[in-house]
Amino acid sequence: MDFPTYPLTEISVTDAMEQAFGIRPVKAVLGLDIICVFENEEQVRQMQPDQAMLMNLEGRIQNATAQGMETDCVSRSFCPKLSIAEDPVCGAAHCQIADYWSKELNKKQIVAYQASRRGGYLYCELRDDGRINISGKAVLVAITDIVAELS
């Protein structure tokens, strides 16, 4: 799928971030969402964030990420402001997470793993036009019919 990227600005790491995630990030950036960067993959995988404290952080989605051991990065996306405790695999968040790691690792193609309970791989390609292609396996979670009256 073809998505936009968003400008990212480094922001100060705060005590509120540490309280929300239970671990102090080593770096934080803000775009449409907040991305807190942690020291290692294990910290991201094992964290048990405080959903109420996450509500106090900037951005609509609160992301935790670290450089991966077998992938370029590992992440988790928490969305209490959207009434979603944790998004299993968040394409919208990776518009920013992959862009961040692309710059950090100096590469255009990023393989990301979202370490939620369900988990999933995202294959991200940063384009020169400021957009990103994201692919991966999708999981069908609902089927519905929409009924509309046409006049």
Please annotate each region the language model reported.
Residues 1-151:
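Active-site proximal loop and beta-alpha junction motif in alpha/beta enzyme cores
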